[in-house]
Curated annotation (Swiss-Prot):
It is an enzyme of class 7 (translocase). The lineage of its organism: Bacteria, Bacillati, Bacillota, Bacilli, Lactobacillales. Part of the ABC transporter complex PstSACB involved in phosphate import. Responsible for energy coupling to the transport system. Residues 5-246 form the ABC transporter domain. The complex is composed of two ATP-binding proteins (PstB), two transmembrane proteins (PstC and PstA) and a solute-binding protein (PstS). CDD domains: ABC_PstB_phosphate_transporter. The keyword Membrane applies. This is Phosphate import ATP-binding protein PstB 2. ATP binds at residues 37-44. It is a peripheral membrane protein. It catalyses: phosphate(out) + ATP + H2O = ADP + 2 phosphate(in) + H(+). GO terms for biological process: phosphate ion transmembrane transport. Belongs to the ABC transporter superfamily. Phosphate importer (TC 3.A.1.7) family.
Amino acid sequence: MENIITSKDVHLSYGNVEALHGISLDFEEKELTALIGPSGCGKSTFLRCLNRMNDDIPNIHISGEIKFENKNIYGPKMDLVELRKDVGMVFQQPSPFPFSVYDNIAYGLRIAGIKDKELIDQRVEESLKQAAIWKETKDNLDRNAQAFSGGQQQRICIARALAVRPKVVLLDEPTSALDPISSSEIEETLLELKHDFTFIMVTHNLQQASRISDYTAFLMSGDLIEYGKTSDMFMNPKKQITSDYLNGRFG
């Protein structure tokens, strides 16, 4: 598989405080990569660099290189709207917009300039099916998306991200606010979808990372400690500190 996103020597500072210390990490296409590590290690900060979600934070400075399909995403010619269409995001707290399920899914399509009602209808249905939420919503497309359960709302958010046909979806702890049953349903959905999309997921749940990811990156204190196939890292980590973290000795 080819690398769809590459990062080289990425540093990020908030004012005089450096949060990322030169991370170099590549992501293979149509694989699910988990970013793990203790709270405050830089997982979410790094994830948000990959589609420039950190841009509006005051006094932030980012250096190094991040490329999406060999294009420098921090270059002067990068179109942010296009980047975020290709590299979508699902947040920790389910965040559907306060309007109907249909309009939530259609939102990104309309922003992208799609006006064909038939095409929008088709994409709405396809995306809700991909996110395994069609059965619960097909007779309630006009219902406010915020009226559904937390797990259903998160799958609606995943469907909204998929509707614009991104190539990569960033997931920032997508199940941490959900109950175990809803979390399991999201995991099953991701296992189905990872054959068609590239996923990069921050998770505190090591069992979740071992169950559904193909590759794992372990970060600590703003440094990349270890990266490799998930099965290899969990069975035979290369570094003692990785073994200590995976075995619950800290974190």
